[in-house]
A protein has these predicted regions:
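Short low-polarity hydrophobic stretches
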Residues: 17, 93, 150-153
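Low-complexity, intrinsically disordered extramembrane tails and loops of integral membrane proteins
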Residues: 1-40, 223-229
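Intrinsically disordered, low-complexity regions enriched in Ser/Pro/Gly/Gln/His and often acidic
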Residues: 5-7, 38-40, 44, 161, ...
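Membrane-helix boundary/juxtamembrane motif in polytopic membrane proteins
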Residues: 151-181, 223-229
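Hydrophobic alpha-helical transmembrane segments in multi-pass membrane proteins
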Residues: 39-92, 97-147, 168-219
Length: 229
């Protein structure tokens, strides 16, 4: 076998075919070790993230002013729980930035969205204009956070399960459809209250479905990385 070094890059082999088996094995072992280390980090934090979705869903129900009045203790507790969980969600995303940098952006924007949401509740804004001024940035921050979170999940899965990786990108598209639908539904109120109510109901169900699918994906993802590590 003609084993020669690359003339332009001394100390490296011209191509993989010319690399001695012992070096190939060393490279494979190094890559596998790195993947296991990444899987260990991801498995740990994604598992915590999975369990955090459950209190988040409970908080979403308890903080629904249509089910419980704004003055009720249940609503206040649900609102506080929602804010705390929102901040924790962002904090938990941050440690995974060592594997994928997009997790850092997702974490920061998740925290900012939760803090703005908290401000909206604390100030008790009644003016529709002020609700729009504070609520719109909160919505935008939340969308950016979800974009980077879902794309981070897709990125880290690419080396482990490409099909699963694509599912996160598809879920992001459906998430955008649901958000757009909710916005349109609120505008339809100006035309038909009944139609708006039906649309809001449909997209609320869609939101629940997205949350369930996300929960399922997080569980499978955490399980995959924990087993790999």
């Amino acid at each position: 076998m003609d084993e020669r070094y690359d003339e332009k890059n001394q100390g490296t082999w011209a191509n993989d075919a010319q690399m001695p088996d012992i070096l190939k094995d060393g490279n494979i072992l190094a890559k596998e070790t790195a993947k296991k280390e990444q899987a260990e980090v991801l498995g740990k934090w994604l598992w915590i993230l999975f369990w955090l979705i459950i209190p988040s869903a409970i908080a979403g129900i308890l903080s629904n002013e249509n089910l419980f009045g704004k003055e009720s203790g249940v609503y206040i507790f649900g609102t506080l729980l929602s804010m705390v969980v929102g901040i924790l969600y962002g904090v938990i995303l941050l440690p995974m930035r060592g594997v994928e940098e997009k997790y850092r952006i997702a974490g920061i924007f998740s925290i900012l969205a939760a803090v703005l949401s908290m401000g909206l509740e604390v100030i008790q804004v009644e003016s529709p204009l002020m609700v729009l001024v504070i609520g719109l940035p909160t919505l935008i921050l939340g969308l950016i956070a979800k974009y980077y979170e879902f794309h981070s999940h897709a990125a880290v899965l690419r080396e482990f399960d490409l099909e699963f990786s694509q599912k996160w990108l598809t879920l992001w598209k459906w998430y955008c459809v649901i958000i757009a639908g909710m916005i349109v539904s609120t505008l339809v109120v100006l035309i038909s209250f009944l139609l708006a109510a039906l649309l809001i109901l449909a997209f609320t169900i869609g939101t629940a479905v997205i949350a369930i699918v996300q929960l399922d994906y997080l569980y499978k993802m955490a399980k995959l990385f924990r087993q790999y590590a």
